[in-house]
Amino acid sequence: MNWSDLNLMPALPEVALLSLLVLLLPADLWASDDKCRWTHYGALATVAVTAAVQLAVWEQGSTSSFNGMYIADGMSRLAKMVLYALTFVLFVYAKPYNQVRGIFKGEFYTLSLFALLGMSVMVSAGHFLTAYIGLELLSLALYALIALRRDSGFAAEAALKYFVLGALASGLLLYGISMVYGATGSLEFAGVLASSFNEEANEWLLKLGLVFIVVAVAFKLGAVPFHMWMPDVYHGAPTSVTALVGTAPKIAAVVFAFRILVTGLGTVHHDWSLMFALLAAASLLVGNLAAIMQTNIKRMLAYSTVSHMGFILLAFMAGAVGFAAGLYYAITYALMAAAGFGVLMVLSDGDNECENISDLAGLNQHRVWLAFLMLLVMFSMAGIPPLMGFYAKFGVIMALLKQGYVWLSVFAVVMSLVGAFYYLRVVKVMYFDESGRARPAAGGNNAAKSLLSVNALLLVLWGIMPQTVIDWCAKALENTL
């Protein structure tokens, strides 16, 4: 590799993030627990500076670094800006929640920033090894974050289960990558795509490797039948960690899947589309039916996430229009989930965790504004117009219809109607059930509550004017496809 091929400028945001993270680590080591607020502010500043660097090096078109192993294009830039915004917002939500529970420590912020670095590498990968390194950096940080609350047996169990299954998925991914390399002789996505057109490429070995890669992608997205870690992780981890696990990594996983399957394995689109159809149908069915039976709202949101991932998998089947719809859906889902978990964190006052649906009973009688924000989240997740969630589902279904997938579209609509039941049940509990206990003052600080309001109201604003975000997604994919 020539030094001229490095071209660090496109990768400057990751360099800045890593540099600031290295400075934050010893600062946290020397700071006492009661001064962790400076680590909090340092983490917020790190994310803000990284976003500013990304904007400073923003340019149209696609550029690469490290001899094509790192790619900066419209999709990676948009995804990273959303990841930075989500991480910043979740740090603000998490501060008061973590302070009460004794987990307001530097580990939360440093591990979260390492996860952010891993996600940034994933979305900019132009090579299988780059994608794998980013994925492992994200996964290792999440394993430790989930077990952050050392006094919780549920957290330890969830972390162990996620670690074991995650290690298995990583092994399958590596095995699939080795088969792709054996079939094409390349690990660079563009090289794999070019080599797969060659008659000398081993088609059967390529397709066998594809199976292992799709399994790994399905695990990271949480699609059925590789979803069993999600309910335990969502339930066992502190809500501040659940919010992080359930939002930003999903966007990174969607872009990761796009890089590998569309950019690298586009020639076998028919094969992985068939697998995605089966995974999507199973995810929609199992996710919605299992969510109906839940009494714990975090487990309910875990199963609802499974159904949302089913919609994203359907979007991948619909070609270029579907890819834009899938990216839009991922951004919409992340905004909805961040707002939903944010409300739960604010309502978890003192040692009382707001985890069960019954904990929301009569919320409108005590916390009118928070009940309204949660109503917006539930309505958006259910796909009720004119909220953002409606246009996300509508975009995917229209993309499917344009490709002739009528039965899949009908099935998705039916499953959306089934899913609306458990979302509306939460609204019914908040507005029509009587609270069985007196409500103490809600947790959270003014910054968290204000940002939460903006987060939830964006679901309305971008629902009324959805074309703004849709155009962002379409333009992001222009120089990628």
From Swiss-Prot:
Subcellular location: Cell inner membrane
Transmembrane segments: 11-31, 38-58, 74-94, 103-123, 128-148, 163-183, 208-228, 241-261, 272-292, 300-322, 332-352, 368-388, 404-424, 450-470
Pfam families hit by this protein: Proton_antipo_M (PF00361)
Taxonomy, superkingdom: Bacteria
Record's bilayer topology term: Multi-pass membrane protein
InterPro entries assigned to the protein according to its UniProt record, in alphabetical order: NADH-Q_OxRdtase_suN/2 (IPR010096), ND/Mrp_TM (IPR001750)
GO molecular function, one term: NADH:ubiquinone reductase (non-electrogenic) activity
Catalytic activity reported: a quinone + NADH + 5 H(+)(in) = a quinol + NAD(+) + 4 H(+)(out)
Subunit structure: NDH-1 is composed of 14 different subunits. Subunits NuoA, H, J, K, L, M, N constitute the membrane sector of the complex.
GO cellular component, one term: plasma membrane
Native source organism of the sequence: Neisseria gonorrhoeae (strain ATCC 700825 / FA 1090)
Annotated HAMAP family: NDH1_NuoN_1
EC number annotated for this UniProt entry: 7.1.1.-
Name under which the protein is recorded: NADH-quinone oxidoreductase subunit N
Principal localisation: membrane
